[in-house]
Amino acid sequence: MGAGIAHCPLSNMYFADAAFPLREALDQDLHVGLGSDLSGGPLPSIFHAALDAVSHSRVREAGTNTHIMDQRGEANSRVSFVEAFWLATHGGGLTLDLPVGIFKPGYYFDALVIDSNTAGSQVRIYDDLDSAQDALEKIIVHTTEPAISAVWVSGKQIK
């Protein structure tokens, strides 16, 4: 049995006084799952945790001081929105050795329907302008409870 890392970016920043080297962990093929630690952050949203993972990786890469760009930051530490989404879904399943996070026979069907047309939704996706990656970024950045129109957990619709 192996080990894995449960990573809550905001909690890590608050309590470890540092940003977790996520890019390096991924490059070493470590099992990392993204989590939302309510006691360590303001929102219990996995979308918010994914946005934090991307934001923190960009801060690590760009640096936090006023030195000239090539004298600050940690090169190649960026994590993409696609990677953050993977960490929030299948990465968590791999870390916990659970069959979750991907749509595949034998895996639990856990899913959300994000509706950009519902009242209160802040998600705006334009078929003629947004690529699939653009749409994913918008979902991660802008999804709040009003945009979630349906929820399935272990194959059972609960909303």
Predicted features along the sequence, with ranges:
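Long hydrophobic segments that form regular secondary structure
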Residues: 1-13
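Conserved beta-strand segments that form the floor/walls of ligand-binding pockets within enzyme
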Residues: 4, 33, 152
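Residue-level signal for inorganic ion chemistry
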Residues: 5, 37, 155
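Conserved residues at beta->alpha junctions
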Residues: 9, 37, 143
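Generic structural "secondary-structure junction" signal
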Residues: 16-17, 40, 138-143
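His/Asp/Glu-enriched, well-ordered alpha-helical/loop segment
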Residues: 18-123
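C-terminal cap of metal-dependent C-N hydrolases
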Residues: 108-159
